Amino acid sequence: MTGDLHKEIRLVDNQYFAQAAERLASGTAVRLSVMGNSMLPFIIGGKDQVTLVPYTGQDLPLGIAALYQWEGKYMIHRLVKKDESHYHFLGDGNICRFETIKRNEVLGILQTIHHPDGKETDTTGRCWLHLGMIWYHIRPVRRYLLFIFRKLFLRSAR
């Protein structure tokens, strides 16, 4: 029974993002609530919301976060590598699972993170991009930093 419930929740999430992808394809920005911890510590699932803007085919800078579909699932992760025909993404809360997509498979660009306290983070500026790439390059110690972050901030917020 719990397995069915888990599948149902994932299906709803996928439908939710599919609707957002349709709006982005029509040229409309979307604001979404996000779930999951794959973008910790920068995006806290279940608390933060994000605004995505349509992708217009421009070359994306390293460090930007984008919405795309990979293996049938919608993701919002950070661009960490690129070549002539592909983008390679990795969630900030992940250590080693890269998602590779064709450049034209990007659906939207993360523009703003809306935090519960009313603060907003611009995710297209130089500071965000550089901070994200620094975070990417310290992968060997990220596991420990994420463990501390979860213990200090996520458990105390419950």
Regions found by a protein language model. Name each.
Residues 1-158:
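Extended hydrophobic leader/signal-anchor segments used for secretion and membrane insertion
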